[in-house]
Amino acid sequence: FAFASDFNQSLSSWDVSNVTSMGSMFEAATSFNGNITGWITTSVTSMSAMFKNATAFNVSVGGWNTSTVTNMSSMFQGASLFNNSLNNWNVSNVLHMQSMFTNASVFNQPINGWNVSNVTNMAVMFSNADAFNQDLNSWVTTSVTNMANMFQFNGGFNGNITGWNTSGVTDMGSMFAGATAFNKDLSTWVVNPNVTDCANFDLSATAWVLARPSFTSCTI
């Protein structure tokens, strides 16, 4: 249904229990808002870009079984009306969350309960997601290597992330650039001495007056 801009039919009766990839399934299906709440997604490994730019979509999918999914990159990117609960999702096998909520401009649901311990890429995850302002301090981020642009141009975020373990992250470029509401003390973050990019880390983060992390291998 990707780019099927007029499609908006019910798919509630579909048996998708053997489907392994739903990547880009409704990408740019700009009218779709059909009931898929009850889908059995136990075999799915990829939901990458599933609702990317699906600008009408706002259906509850919080009951889906996502325990086998490894890729959620760009899943709700540009899904500008989506604002449903996802906190009960099992994301323990997900590796890729880059751009997951980029430009998801009204999404502001708690996801602090997620087990993100296997995620390696969170780049651009909440960029331009201006409504999002939830605490994420319970996240175990020890596997993450890329947080570049993670909160870039997010004008609303000031959630608690002070307890994150960032010792494995090597790319923090523009992580908070243009995050004009953010103001947290991140002095306790342990920064990887092998960070390759921290340029523009806090560029135009105009509200941030509390302590930054200490970088030894690059200049912010």
Please name every model-derived segment:
Residues 1-220:
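Negatively charged
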